[in-house]
Amino acid sequence: MSLLTEVETPTRNGWECRCSDSSDPLVIAASIIGILHLILWILDRLFFKCIYRRLKYGLKRGPSTEGVPESMREEYRQEQQNAVDVDDGHFVNIELE
């Protein structure tokens, strides 16, 4: 016997719920909370990088460079850019024996 047949029973009109008091305010509130939780979870998974970056740095684009000399700022920018750049001309070939 499958789990589906234990919870819901197919009828001629469609799927019938065995809950007798589905109009109970507590059941309605729990359903609304469950649906909102699902929506928020989906949005969190879709936009987690944007959300947590915004929480970490606020509206700024990155860590603060206030009080840092201009030469060090330029060096930091170069390091960040070099970490992002990919040299397509160099690949590592690994041969398995």
From Swiss-Prot:
The record marks 37 as: Essential for channel activity, possibly by being protonated during channel activation, and by forming the channel gate and the selective filter. Residues 1-22 are virion surface. The modification Phosphoserine is found at residue 64. It is a single-pass type III membrane protein. GO terms for molecular function: monoatomic ion channel activity; proton transmembrane transporter activity. Residues 61-80 are annotated as: Disordered. One of its GO terms (cellular component) is virion membrane. Gene3D superfamilies: 6.10.250.1640. A lipid is attached at residue 50 (S-palmitoyl cysteine). The chain crosses the membrane at residues 23-43. Pfam families: Flu_M2. It is found in: Virion membrane; Host apical cell membrane. The M2 protein from most influenza A strains is inhibited by amantadine and rimantadine, resulting in viral uncoating incapacity. Emergence of amantadine-resistant variants is usually rapid. Keywords: Disulfide bond, Host cell membrane, Host membrane, Host-virus interaction, Hydrogen ion transport, Inhibition of host autophagy by virus, Ion channel, Ion transport, Lipoprotein, Membrane, Palmitate, Phosphoprotein, Signal-anchor, Transmembrane, Transmembrane helix, Transport, Viral ion channel, Virion. One of its GO terms (biological process) is symbiont genome entry into host cell via pore formation in plasma membrane. The record marks 41 as: Seems to be involved in pH gating. Residues 44-97 are intravirion. Homotetramer; composed of two disulfide-linked dimers held together by non-covalent interactions. May interact with matrix protein 1. Forms a proton-selective ion channel that is necessary for the efficient release of the viral genome during virus entry. After attaching to the cell surface, the virion enters the cell by endocytosis. Acidification of the endosome triggers M2 ion channel activity. Belongs to the influenza viruses matrix protein M2 family. When the channel is activated, one or more imidazole moieties of His-37 probably become bi-protonated. Cytoplasmic tail plays an important role in virion assembly and morphogenesis. This is Matrix protein 2. The lineage of its organism: Viruses, Riboviria, Orthornavirae, Negarnaviricota, Polyploviricotina.
